[in-house]
């Protein structure tokens, strides 16, 4: 397990810019969990969802920053590496606007 400092406002109000979050490597992510990901050369803290076709959705919790959402199609060949689950008091709801 480890801690990481979050930069940016895309995860507010659940995770504030500059705050430190704790990450569990042992917990597998399920839809709606928040994780730390390495995608296309960038580290990201995002909410995770995967559909039945294997497409991965990485959401910003701050819906004013939905421009930072990512969709990684299963057929894209892009590797999404998850370093672990961010430990939050409760699981945030998945966005309704995707």
Region spans (language model):
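Acidic/glycine-rich C-terminal interaction modules and beta/coil loop segments
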Residues: 1-98
């Amino acid at each position: 397990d480890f801690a990481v400092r979050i930069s940016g406002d895309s995860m507010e109000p659940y995770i504030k810019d500059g705050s430190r979050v704790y990450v569990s490597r042992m917990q597998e992510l399920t839809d709606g969990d928040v994780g730390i990901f390495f995608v296309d050369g960038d580290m990201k803290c995002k909410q995770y969802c995967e559909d039945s076709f294997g497409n991965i959705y990485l959401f910003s919790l701050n819906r004013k920053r939905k421009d930072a959402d990512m969709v990684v199609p299963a057929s894209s060949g892009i590797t999404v590496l998850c370093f672990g689950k961010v430990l939050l008091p409760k699981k945030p709801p998945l966005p309704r606007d995707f």
